[in-house]
Amino acid sequence: MSWQTYVDEHLMCEIEGHHLASAAILGHDGTVWAQSADFPQFKPEEITGIMKDFDEPGHLAPTGMFVAAAKYMVIQGEPGAVIRGKKGAGGITIKKTGQALVVGIYDEPMTPGQCNMVVERLGDYLLKQGL
C-alpha cells in the first residue's frame, strides 16, 4: 500500500460524518511521504522543535507548537509518543512511529477525540509493522 493510500483512506476517512481538515505522513526529518491536498508546509525549525519535544517532553509547552507559522497551544499528550495541540476551535495530533510522524489537523465540527483516534490508530498500526 502506498503512503498516499494511507493518507487518503486511513487519515482522511469519514468519522461520524466528519473528516480531518488535512493530514500527512512525514519522515522524522520533515520529508513529506504523503499528504492531503490542503496540508500546510512545515518549516524545518518547526520539525526540529516537534522532534525535540518527543525527546524532551514539555519542550514546546512554554512557547507553543508552530505548524506553517500557525501557533498551537500544546495540550495533554503521551510523552515521547503523541503531541496534541489546540488552536481556536481546531487542533492537531502528531503520532511518532519508528520512522514517521503521522499528522492530523482538524477543525469543528470534528472533535479532538475523533482526530486523536484516526491519527493514533494509523500510528499504532505502523508501529506494529515496524515502521
Curated annotation (Swiss-Prot):
InterPro entries: PFN, PFN_euk, PFN_sf, Profilin_CS. GO terms for molecular function: actin monomer binding. It comes from the Eukaryota. It holds the Pfam family Profilin. CDD domains: PROF (cd00148). The keyword Nucleotide-binding does not apply. Binds to actin and affects the structure of the cytoskeleton. At high concentrations, profilin prevents the polymerization of actin, whereas it enhances it at low concentrations. Occurs in many kinds of cells as a complex with monomeric actin in a 1:1 ratio. This is Profilin-6. It comes from Phleum pratense (Common timothy).
